[in-house]
Swiss-Prot record:
Superkingdom of origin: Bacteria
Keywords: ATP-binding, Cytoplasm, DNA damage, DNA recombination, DNA repair, DNA-binding, Nucleotide-binding, SOS response
Name of the molecule in the record: Protein RecA
Any single biological process term in GO: SOS response
A single Gene Ontology CC term: cytosol
Lineage: Bacteria, Pseudomonadati, Pseudomonadota, Gammaproteobacteria, Enterobacterales
Organism of provenance: Yersinia pseudotuberculosis serotype O:1b (strain IP 31758)
Length: 356
């Protein structure tokens, strides 16, 4: 239905006034003068990139990664940093837990010489540092480890045992309101690592919840629930963890998908193992008995040997990665995809939250 001429003139005048007062681009038609594609950064896991539906985590947004202890939360964020640094991006790590291991980070491919790191004294200080880095426009990825360790100043200055109901939740709520717009303008990805707590007295449903109040849940474009589901063994020796990640919330593609991969101790995500599994599943790699073949050439007997072959031949691994992304992600470039994986509803953290 056409808008009459007087309304069009009035609208044009209003738009002109808004742009004059607030700057060009402050208001626009959704399909005009802007890219609708979402720029993403790889998570370091091909199956998780596919499950996210956009080829990775979205720039300019807030992401929450939560799970039990030793489930791989920090490892996953370090893999994101390594992937971002390979693209020439600047990254920062806000270590509120004071537990970052630079030797481990280096093993995962992180350039620790160019990684900005802060160990703030209070939660307010950590969030102000995040805001300052974002407003600089020079930092592409910021990791906060973790929300549970963002202790309000009043709690630190008080006595142990003092009641500080809702302080952390209010602090996070104020920070989200301030950060969300700045992150979008600077096209900076902000990832919060969070811990799980148990709600007391829950008889039915999931008693798990995350710390820091409800604000982060609402402002996050992506929420990932990461869990350790088994052990990776070399003989009788445990060498890693079988890990499952559920996409509990996703504003950039369909949610509720999940990915499974291995995290090897001292190495990080076993991307070559993922390539073998996905290659077999989508018939790019042939499997006859225990032997794996690619383009007619045998690459190994058993998954471990096939993975080692890809590790020793990065050009073939890159070719296989590219083919899988083109096959499984729409757009063919691995950056603006819709996942082809089967949707599975997550039984993730309950949306009701309490302050701990």
């Amino acid at each position: 239905m056409a808008i009459d001429e007087n309304k069009q003139k009035a609208l044009a005048a209003a738009l002109g006034q808004i742009e004059k007062q607030f700057g060009k681009g402050s208001i626009m038609r959704l399909g005009e003068d802007r890219s609708m594609d979402v720029e993403t950064i790889s998570t370091g896991s091909l199956s998780l990139d596919i499950a996210l539906g956009a080829g990775g985590l979205p720039m300019g947004r807030i992401v929450e990664i939560y799970g039990p202890e030793s489930s791989g939360k920090t490892t996953l964020t370090l893999q994101v940093i390594a992937a971002a640094q390979r693209e020439g991006k600047t990254c920062a790590f806000i270590d509120a837990e004071h537990a970052l291991d630079p030797i481990y980070a280096k093993k995962l491919g992180v350039d620790i010489d160019n990684l900005l790191c802060s160990q703030p004294d209070t939660g307010e200080q950590a969030l102000e540092i995040c805001d300052a880095l974002t407003r600089s426009g020079a930092v592409d990825v910021i990791i906060v480890d973790s929300v549970a360790a963002l202790t309000p100043k009043a709690e630190i200055e008080g006595e142990i045992g003092d009641s500080h109901m809702g302080l952390a939740a209010r602090m996070m709520s104020q920070a989200m309101r301030k950060l969300a717009g700045n992150l979008k303008n600077a096209n900076t990805l902000l990832i919060f690592i969070n811990q799980i707590r148990m709600k007391i007295g829950v008889m039915f449903g999931n008693p798990e919840t995350t710390t820091g109040g409800n604000a982060l849940k609402f402002y996050a474009s992506v929420r990932l629930d990461i869990r350790r589901i088994g052990a990776v063994k070399d003989g009788d020796v445990v060498v890693g963890s079988e890990t499952r990640v559920k996409v509990v919330k996703n504003k950039i593609a369909a949610p509720f998908k999940q990915a499974e991969f291995q995290i090897l101790y001292g190495e990080g995500i076993n991307i070559n193992g993922e390539l073998v599994d996905l290659g077999v599943k989508h018939k790019l790699i042939e499997k006859a008995g225990a032997w794996y073949s690619y383009n007619g050439d045998k690459i190994g007997q058993g998954k471990a040997n096939a993975s080692n072959y890809l590790k020793e031949n990065p050009a073939i691994a890159a070719e296989l990665d590219k083919k899988l992304r083109e096959m499984l992600l729409n757009g063919g470039n691995g950056e603006q995809p819709v996942a082809a994986a089967t949707a599975e509803f997550a039984d993730g953290v309950d949306e009701t939250n309490e302050e701990f």
